[in-house]
Amino acid sequence: MSDETIPLGPINEGGASCGVGPWEGPVPEDPRYDPELLALGDRRNVEDHYRYWTMDAIREDLKRRSLPFEVAIENLGHDFNIGSIVRTANALGAARVHIVGRRRWNRRGAMVTDRYLEVDHVDSAQALADSCVSRGLVLVGVDNVPGSLPLESTELPRRACLVFGEESNGLSEEMIDLCECVVKISQRGSTRSMNVGHAAAIVMWEHARKLSAEQE
């Protein structure tokens, strides 16, 4: 049996079903393939090279290919942006995501990507800091508070845990105090800040770009 129910594929603008149908040709013997998906088709939101793979096989491959950074999100008020940040972390190769504070979070924006990525829960900012320090990671906050450093001119630690706050209030004071540094995205417009999901995507992409360049 597959690791998740195969839903009817969403319909795109051309009227065609997304995903792929049943496997055509000789059935592969590679254990990464899911017999049920091979027989019925794969409508999941996964990259083409993961089509027909089991969920466990995808998770293991993502662990192997992940970059040496993690992401943490303060969940103090059930922010709807958390799902979007988790999805971006999956797309850009984060090794792990931590939900800090409330255990329950809105998964809708994650588009099921949290099933393939290691997502855990920690009760507090201090618990996150303790976990990261014990594994050699450095907390790097992202917020436009006094004293924050411009992202474009700041060299981030390779093994950073990028920490994002809530849409309305940003990072908590406790979290800021625990961060090695806090970076901000330079802006030119009139708004004081951008959406936290968008800001997270920019910071993660920039850090992932530099880490990927080191591996080339």
What are these regions (language model features)?
Residues 1-216:
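Post-transcriptional modification and biogenesis factors for structured RNAs
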